[in-house]
């Protein structure tokens, strides 16, 4: 049986019009509007087996998600770190990409009410910032930048973090499914819509470099942004997943070396604006 989810801007969050000032729209409001547009487009899709349940934290965790965007996306961004889609113990709980609970609450300073998704899998309850499970990928990702940057404002001065796809897919057993696990036809329908949204988001933020976190995110970004004017550079970064033997050998060291190759370390550690290495 196909699974269909709807994500209307209903009681889970304010209507789109409430994000807009009468005379001017901020960059953060524009970004949130693009996310709501993407939600509306994705709500028309249906997904067959192996998908059992779909979560969209941009909907039910709207309050902390909105707080994340409005606090840290106030101006143009040179660099966008792009994940693929939410994890069950990260963004699915907090509404923040790679959003390990402790980092979101204690370092990023993000809070807010998290509602229950329309359909909740009993093995993957949404507990919001009370979730006791730590997401290893998120703890590694944000923990690295916490050590490198010191304060969130240093990181977000030139950078932002976003997921290509806002949806989390679960099998009937509760097992996490990545977009790569979906049937080819449905995967392409999903990611084509997300690709188009990424183009709009990158142009809105003025991004010059997209760093795909993981091979699939990098590949989709290259495909989506090919031929975009002005040109956007796309590079890759090893995913911090605990399922990656390479990441388990020392993701932080690998990440630092990669950022140094890309010329990004000065951008993340001092006040000067340093352009990414072409």
Swiss-Prot record:
Species of the source: Rattus norvegicus (Rat)
GO cellular component, one term: nucleolus
Name listed for the protein in its UniProt record: Single-strand selective monofunctional uracil-DNA glycosylase
Superkingdom to which the source organism belongs: Eukaryota
UniProt-annotated location(s): Nucleus
CDD domains xrefs: UDG-F3_SMUG1-like
Family in the record: Belongs to the uracil-DNA glycosylase (UDG) superfamily. SMUG1 family.
Record keyword DNA repair present: yes
High-level lineage: Eukaryota, Metazoa, Chordata, Craniata, Vertebrata
Class of the enzyme per the UniProt entry, highest EC level: hydrolase
């Amino acid at each position: 049986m196909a699974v269909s989810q709807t994500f209307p801007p209903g009681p889970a969050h304010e209507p789109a019009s409430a994000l807009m000032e009468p005379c001017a729209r901020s960059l953060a409001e524009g970004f949130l509007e693009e996310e709501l547009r993407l939600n509306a487009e994705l709500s028309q899709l249906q997904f067959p087996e192996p998908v059992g349940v779909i979560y969209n934290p941009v909907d039910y965790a709207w309050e902390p998600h909105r707080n994340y965007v409005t606090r840290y996306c106030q101006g143009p961004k040179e660099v966008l770190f792009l994940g693929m889609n939410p994890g069950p113990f990260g963004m699915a709980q907090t509404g923040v990409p790679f959003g390990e609970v402790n980092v979101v609450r204690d370092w990023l300073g993000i809070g807010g009410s998290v509602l229950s998704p329309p359909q909740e899998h009993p093995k993957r309850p949404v507990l919001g910032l009370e979730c006791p499970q730590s997401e290893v990928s998120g703890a590694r990702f944000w923990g690295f930048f916490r050590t490198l940057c010191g304060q969130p404002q240093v990181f977000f001065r030139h950078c932002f973090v976003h997921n290509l796809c806002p949806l989390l897919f679960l099998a009937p057993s509760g097992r996490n499914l990545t977009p790569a696990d979906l049937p080819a036809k449905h995967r392409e329908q999903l990611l084509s819509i997300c690709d188009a949204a990424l183009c709009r988001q990158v142009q809105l933020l003025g991004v010059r470099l997209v760093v795909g976190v993981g091979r699939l995110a990098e590949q989709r970004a290259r495909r989506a942004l090919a031929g975009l004017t002005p040109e956007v550079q796309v590079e890759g970064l090893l995913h911090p997943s605990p399922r990656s033997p390479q990441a388990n050998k020392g993701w932080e060291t690998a990440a630092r070396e990669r950022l140094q190759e890309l010329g990004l370390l000065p951008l993340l550690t001092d006040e000067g604006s340093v352009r990414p290495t072409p």
